[in-house]
Amino acid sequence: MVQRVVDRDYYDILNISVDADGDTIKKSYRRLAILYHPDKNRENPEAAREKFQKLAEAYQVLSDPKLREKYDKLGKVGAVPDAGFEDAFEFFKNLFGGDSFRDYVGELNLLKELCKMINEEPELKAIEDTEESKKQLQREESKEADRLLQERIDVLCKNLLDKLSIWTETDMSDRVTDAFKQKMQFEAELLKDESFGNEMLHAIGSTYVQRANILIQSQSFLGIRGVWGSLCAKGTLLKDTWNTVVSAVDVQSSAAALAKAEEGEEQWSKEKRDEAARELTGKVLSATWKGTRFEVQSVIRTVSDKILYDKAVPLEKRINRANALLMIGQVFLKVAPNEKSDANYFEDLMNDRGK
């Protein structure tokens, strides 16, 4: 027997039954939050922002047993959280690793810009929107972006040097080496439990290994292996760039098809629309992750190269840095995700639907 509630609105917003369990509520919210993110619905940003915030509001109430009980008995008025409703966009700030990876990559610009762009209220412009004013604004924004990026790189270089010094500023004996690897293994095991933690570790680890090997192998006979490694790295970069663009185009195409079906232009059954929505969610995740991975690896390359090719530092010490970086990268690449972990929900959705 289905329980009686005084208000079904929150349940309808999340597309769940009134007797849905906590796991069902969480999964439905996560899927809908990805699908209806305002950045994917730019034709009507105000309506999209409102819908997105309602999703977060419904989830905050129904995911809390005490608030849910109040809502079922009293409706929305009786179920307002003591601290008010959370910002829906905080969800996206923690989508790829959150603060746990900040020491490695800083604040991710892609997600920051998505949240900033959608969260800002439209403002009346005080000056005429001329071509010249647009160019001036672009120049100012570009200059500020360059400044922030340089600050970010400087901080990340210091963070990485501090981490490498745990090994490089010692006698680098077998005992110290084993302890260093164990420390990094312990850190990696904690990081992998974050949202997209395993993917983040592999993106960072593969770049560490790549950059470290290029320097180490450049010291071999004629440096041929180092040159080859550099060429392979450029090929990987081109491939990743292409895949990122293709994913974005695929999302636009799928979103347009689903929009037509929702508006009744295409005669799709409910089952077909639901399946298309699930597939689109996976594709959105896949495209967003590829863009994020591109940014992560770009930053990691810049930081790694800056500390490995600092001419003010003796070559021997830079080689030691490369060896420490190589060890961290290898540890990160060996990390495997927890089977059937709730933290892997997004990854599973992306891998199932975003191919």
Swiss-Prot record:
Pfam families: DnaJ, DnaJ-X
Domain J intervals: 9-75
Signal peptide residue numbers: none
Cited InterPro entries: DnaJ_domain (IPR001623), DnaJ_domain_CS (IPR018253), DnaJ_X (IPR026894), J_dom_sf (IPR036869)
Localization: Cytoplasm
SUPFAM superfamilies, per the entry: Chaperone J-domain
Molecular-function annotations in GO: Hsp70 protein binding
Keywords annotated in UniProt: Chaperone, Cytoplasm
Presence of keyword Acetylation: no
UniProt-recorded name of the protein: Uncharacterized J domain-containing protein C3E7.11c
Species of provenance: Schizosaccharomyces pombe (strain 972 / ATCC 24843)
